[in-house]
Design a protein with these regions (language model features):
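Bacterial Sec-dependent N-terminal signal peptides
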Residues: 1-6
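Bacterial N-terminal signal peptides
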Residues: 9-20
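Extracellular/periplasmic metallocenter environments
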Residues: 25-34, 79-116
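N-terminal edge beta-strand
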Residues: 26-51
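N-terminal post-signal-peptidase region of extra-cytosolic proteins
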Residues: 39-45, 72-73, 81-85
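Beta-strand cores of secreted/periplasmic/IMS beta-sandwich domains, seen most often
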Residues: 45-64, 84-96
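Short, surface-exposed beta-strand/strand-loop-strand elements in extracellular ectodomains
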Residues: 65-72
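Short edge-strand/loop segments of extracellular domains
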Residues: 72-74, 115-116
Length: 116
């Protein structure tokens, strides 16, 4: 009886391990700071991310309103001290991001992130 329980326990553990390996991968998280150290700049916590689901956690630490646009999606306009989360799916290559407030991208509030 003990041997049978052990065999069943090992089989169940193996199935659980296989199921977790097949589970959908979790999204990569990137912290984005707008407005600091310079008002018209973004600072990203990562310069490279794996292809797939990416969650951008955007915080405006400046005093001017900003948003964050990437892969055809964007956050709402964020006043100083406000935050938003943006979930996108990125393909391999370079993904461009920018602030859509008129004049901000031209002043340097844009960039790319490498997707591998």
């Amino acid at each position: 009886m003990t041997r049978m329980r052990l065999t069943i326990g090992v089989a169940v553990a193996g199935l659980a391990l296989a199921a977790s390996a097949l589970a959908a991968p979790t999204a990569t998280s990137v912290t984005v700071t707008a407005g600091k150290p310079s008002e018209l700049r973004f600072t990203l916590s990562k310069k490279t991310v794996p292809a797939g689901a990416v969650t951008f956690k955007v915080t405006n630490k400046g005093t001017v309103i900003h948003d964050f646009k990437i892969a055809g999606k964007k956050t709402k306009m964020l006043a100083g001290g406000r935050s938003a989360t943006l979930k996108v799916t990125l393909k391999k290559g370079k993904a461009a991001f920018l602030c859509t407030v008129p004049g901000h991208a031209a002043a340097g509030m844009k960039g790319t992130i490498t997707v591998k």
